[in-house]
Amino acid sequence: MARKSNLPVLLVPFLLCQALVRCSSPLPLVVNTWPFKNATEAAWRALASGGSALDAVESGCAMCEREQCDGSVGFGGSPDELGETTLDAMIMDGTTMDVGAVGDLRRIKNAIGVARKVLEHTTHTLLVGESATTFAQSMGFINEDLSTTASQALHSDWLARNCQPNYWRNVIPDPSKYCGPYKPPGILKQDIPIHKETEDDRGHDTIGMVVIHKTGHIAAGTSTNGIKFKIHGRVGDSPIPGAGAYADDTAGAAAATGNGDILMRFLPSYQAVEYMRRGEDPTIACQKVISRIQKHFPEFFGAVICANVTGSYGAACNKLSTFTQFSFMVYNSEKNQPTEEKVDCI
């Protein structure tokens, strides 16, 4: 009788543990913006082969750089107003809070790789422009042209359309009608219309990636070639910690995609992580970030992905007539393949 009555008691802790495992969100976890499946797979392979969260983020973003995801990541896309493709990237370690980033990187294809070298081999956070290229070469990266026939054609067509759209305002000649060079009107009294950006809504498809290792270590990163026909030297939100992405082992991680010139003003990734630190569900945290920006820029294009320390994840986006749903990729220990998920924009 004693043996029979003790058996259920002995099983209680085991059954409780099993129930808790099923109810908790599984780790490891990879989440990235947009349906960039191969990037998700590359990150997962890095984890499966014993790599760290940083290794996974670097591998995933590097895959998109090689594949030129959606023309908005890597070489051969988004030429600036001079016809040059430049790259921004960042990687962040949520354990040490170290960050490595590059902005306006020229003639180096593997931007996320250079960003990691900044993290590992300097005490700096961000290197930019030609100096970032010099650093990359010292780290063994190859200096090569990032332009392609496709990017050159995009630029030629833009010039033929009188440089429309562009990102200038309050200058002469009128940027809504003519190409530059531009200059401030100075003391000349001229009726210069306020220039309204007419960007392609899908022209900001940065890859942002969040990885949570099975040990709980968290990393996040980004890579992009920015926006088409940007002013030469422009750096977006992607390489800015707290804007493009943010990671903290004690709270979670987030990454943003969209109009970087607006997003960076609100540090959405940092804000989302802080919401999760307070106990907000990842989806709610993402929605709150979007709502904060909406109050000032109701027509902005943008989305955010979030994941907390348990592996729960979510996303949110700003609803526009041309953008009503946001797609992102998820891979965790319960899935046998990367899965595309969608959220309705708010």
Swiss-Prot record:
It holds the Pfam family Asparaginase_2. Substrate binds at residues 234-237, 257-260. The active site is at residue 206. Glycans are attached at residues 38, 308. CDD domains: Glycosylasparaginase. It is found in: Lysosome. Residues 1-23 form the signal peptide. Heterotetramer of two alpha and two beta chains arranged as a dimer of alpha/beta heterodimers. This is N(4)-(beta-N-acetylglucosaminyl)-L-asparaginase. It comes from Homo sapiens.
